[in-house]
Amino acid sequence: MDFLPTQVFYGRRWRPRMPPRPWRPRMPTMQRPDQQARQMQQLIAAVSTLALRQNAAAPQRGKKKQPRRKKPKPQPEKPKKQEQKPKQKKAPKRKPGRRERMCMKIEHDCIFEVKHEGKVTGYACLVGDKVMKPAHVPGVIDNADLARLSYKKSSKYDLECAQIPVAMKSDASKYTHEKPEGHYNWHYGAVQYTGGRFTVPTGVGKPGDSGRPIFDNKGPVVAIVLGGANEGTRTALSVVTWNKDMVTKITPEGTVEWAASTVTAMCLLTNISFPCFQPSCAPCCYEKGPEPTLRMLEENVNSEGYYDLLHAAVYCRNSSRSKRSTANHFNAYKLTRPYVAYCADCGMGHSCHSPAMIENIQADATDGTLKIQFASQIGLTKTDTHDHTKIRYAEGHDIAEAARSTLKVHSSSECTVTGTMGHFILAKCPPGERISVSFVDSKNEHRTCRIAYHHEQRLIGRERFTVRPHHGIELPCTTYQLTTAETSEEIDMHMPPDIPDRTILSQQSGNVKITVNGRTVRYSSSCGSQAVGTTTTDKTINSCTVDKCQAYVTSHTKWQFNSPFVPRRMQAERKGKVHIPFPLINTTCRVPLAPEALVRSGKREATLSLHPIHPTLLSYRTFGAERVFDEQWITAQTEVTIPVPVEGVEYQWGNHKPQRFVVALTTEGKAHGWPHEIIEYYYGLHPTTTIVVVIRVSVVVLLSFAASVYMCVVARTKCLTPYALTPGAVVPVTIGVLCCAPKAHAASFAEGMAYLWDNNQSMFWMELTGPLALLILATCCARSLLSCCKGSFLVAMSIGSAVASAYEHTAIIPNQVGFPYKAHVAREGYSPLTLQMQVIETSLEPTLNLEYITCDYKTKVPSPYVKCCGTAECRTQDKPEYKCAVFTGVYPFMWGGAYCFCDSENTQMSEAYVERADVCKHDHAAAYRAHTASLRAKIKVTYGTVNQTVEAYVNGDHAVTIAGTKFIFGPVSTPWTPFDTKILVYKGELYNQDFPRYGAGQPGRFGDIQSRTLDSRDLYANTGLKLARPAAGNIHVPYTQTPSGFKTWQKDRDSPLNAKAPFGCIIQTNPVRAMNCAVGNIPVSMDIADSAFTRLTDAPVISELTCTVSTCTHSSDFGGIAVLSYKVEKSGRCDIHSHSNVAVLQEVSIETEGRSVIHFSTASASPSFVVSVCSSRATCTAKCEPPKDHVVTYPANHNGVTLPDLSSTAMTWAQHLAGGVGLLIALAVLILVIVTCVTLRR
């Protein structure tokens, strides 16, 4: 974004606040926002109070007390101020801290409120030479000069920017890109910056704070706040900040924009709309009219301002919005009451109607905490007041109290209760198959309910433990927050049904008397004309019996929980809702760290000595195309050997961070020793190849020796046989010597050649050319052998690396992080230039299409509707997997008696549907379709005085300009991606896995519920939900359902791609990408300008350059040290370069001081490479030893090609062997040729 500030032209300086200039249209300081004025007044008052507190004397304290002793009368202004000062002492926590005072001082000039319809929605900030306002904040800046500016909008950074007016530039703050980890300042105090993220304690910051700046400890702005993401005890801030070269936006996952809402929610009552937070109607106070108030809330239950309306109805303050307090979190429960419901097991194996009925248990917290909902209410008294030591429960039609200390929760043993409020209990229980809740009532009787519930300890991390450790590491987890404040979670309430009670009916002389005891009673009978009615006073039904009467206690002044074990009053479901405590939040849990593995390295393997305290998971993966992945739980002390291929391996032990191993080419023997030591050396590196070569050489030597012996034997036979058959024949001297004939007498060589010339000239030439042919043959064999070995050696060492002399240059750099590419660019008239390119980071990002999100579900079962003496009918509702069924022949009973009193048949309408579980916002999986991936690479380019890192998309051609030089990167040689076309993302893990399409989920499988987002209304569900017939006599809604497919997938899922990705890829999920995959090469073309070179006349001049290698360890990262000696005729700085891939130099340039030490890395045992310093060159030759360690934790920065890599000593021995064998064969051939020539001559 080119209009963001990249330089600061105006610094901040201190000066007294001046009055408005006559020509300046800016309003006086008094028109600054009221909030800031109040803050400044509070600051001045707090500082004054602090000064008075430190410097006050005894007479001054006496003066403060004098006005109190006088009679009441109008006080002057001065004593009033003195009376107000002590009030500040009562609330010292309101005094701004040092950080807040500093920010308020700076903010007074550089930030302005943004208002929409008179309401503050955010802030704008003057930074550098720009005014910045978050783009998502509606409204205009509350300043006439700034409001009329023309703003440019950047959707990438969510900012609107404009140039600051000249008259206001002195008010702007500086900014800085330097952000060392630590604490920074903003309006509410300290901001922690660690790991590239800004965080504040949860509860600090809210909607309306968007646009506030974050300052460093000296005053410059380091970031601008846009929003926040709740992460449990901390809130991660979404900010726009500055890096060294660019502006960047940091957006944590789950970020909510902090612009204040501008919409006023409206509610309805009898077709009259009003603001929900400020109702102006008569029945809007619960204390004045409970029943109409509840009905009003039921009619607006789906309104966005429902809770504002509920708050106004409870507090009965219609004139203004009242401030909510922590002490009033229980006040919403004034509208509710506990209840009694059917419990199948009341502690002794029998059923009952219990006030301790367990409605629901949630075990979504990964720290093992259970959230239990039951029928009674904790922390409330029967008079609707708050008392955390009390439990109120339903005792018939009344409400009774019990002591909170008698509450017990049991599993396989007693649980620890950690929090209670309303209907909810937080408890940590040992693993078990049941849960029971009990308390002792006011009559000293135990009220218990028990249900079957399987629960076990959840696994956090990679070690199974039972006790929280004192020392370890913190891992992300979830827990139920111990807060009673309003949350986003809620439960449904409804008007309770009429409760049958036969105890209020009594028989008196043929009449039935109804004793109401101050209640409202609805009655019905089959006697006379007074069949049905409602009464609030005692009533007598004449000429009737109790068996023909039924009485119901009616109470519509309070809600109760919408329980499936209590019938609802009406078929049309009317409900309200209240917030529930203890929301599920993200936090961190301390987990143990197993003792570190002891590593013993071997040849291409590493042995881990493991000493686990708990069952601990060990996993490893190898790099390369053919990956190997394995994991196992280690329960006892053991040793595990893992292979270490050439590409490397990564293992993770328990909760420790992953460790990587790379093979070091170590071996026994010596590359520069005797033949058996050389064979031992190469056998350790390449056993198969060494065995094959040794066998082949041995066979060749043996065959050569056998052939030589055979030729000698044949020659001797041919030359001796004629003389043996001829009596008196004399063997010539030459033949005798060649054939080892005893007593041989032969003519001299000259006589023999003269005889051949006279008698057979053909034989003369044959005998003359034999030795010459043998000499030529030996020479050719030696040359061929030397040429062959030398060619192979040069090919292996890649002699002749890139030296470019053309104007357009091309190169191919490896797509491997940390592996440098270096080239020597030569241009006529200029000193050679060293070019180095190195991949710093790669990111393979696929194009994703979100198919749906899936998670656990919860089954909502509303209270059943029982139609007495009639038939109920189901109605279609637009809810996920909505099921409705009507069952006849039911005879429900409640604690007060039969619910229905008639001769005809009763029916029960049961309903159930599926919703996303509350845990979904913390625990869900996203199903994506992956398409073409883009490969983004960060490449560090160094040449001359240029050292810059650039980003390029190398899956195609991407041009980048670096210091005036145009570089074109890509396309990468090997298009590859680790992602399949269908992928799943779950809690930072990625899985290549197939999944059903949207709307085709199956019960019990992944995707049984599906939605586009976590709060959308397009939820699809197929969980196999079926309603069952209720048991006779009980009010309940039985159903069957397939267990959650998401939970099943969690248990059965395979290892994620994060743990087994090939080529060393690091898988990230926010966004989805594969980092640092070592696959393929990246072609580069460039056009280096002349200005990047140094002319020969300006370059340093050195001569007599020599290179001496002092020490060398091959296959080690820069394990070689060489000393360059030279004479300096003109000093300066010279580029240094190796002209061979055999060795990679660590240094790029050196200062010419006559002697320089350089470091190089090589995989060769006898490297020989040319080093150039400026225009001079020298050859470095070394004899390297193998490294001592078999396995190392870092890759070496050199060419890993080692075959055929023969050391100079091995080459010498090979030449000697070849020369000896060749000489033996040559002698045998020479003897055979001479003998053949002589025999043919005869």
Curated annotation (Swiss-Prot):
Region (Functions as an uncleaved signal peptide for the precursor of protein E3/E2), start-end ranges: 259-272
Glycosylated at which positions?
Answer: N271, N586, N760, N947, N1076
Chain spans, region Disordered? 14-101
Motif Nuclear localization signal covers 59-96
Q: Where is this motif: Nuclear export signal?
A: 141-151
Q: Name one Pfam family in it.
A: Peptidase_S3
Query: Biased composition, Basic residues: where in the chain?
Result: 61-73, 87-98
Where is region (Interaction with the capsid protein) located?
A: 714-718
- Which residue ranges does the record annotate as region Ribosome-binding? 96-110
Question: Where in this protein does the record put region Binding to the viral RNA?
Answer: 82-111
Q: Which domain of life is it from?
A: Viruses
> Any ranges marked Extracellular in the topology annotation, and which?
325-690, 747-761, 807-1217
Q: Region E1 fusion peptide loop: which residues?
A: 890-907
Tell me, what is one Gene Ontology molecular-function annotation carried by this entry? Answer: structural molecule activity
Q: SUPFAM superfamilies, alphabetically?
A: E set domains, Trypsin-like serine proteases, Viral glycoprotein, central and dimerisation domains
Query: Which segments carry the region annotation Host transcription inhibition?
Result: 35-66
Q: What else is known?
A: Belongs to the Old World alphaviruses that usually cause fever, maculopapular rash, arthralgia and myalgia.
Q: What is this protein called?
A: Structural polyprotein
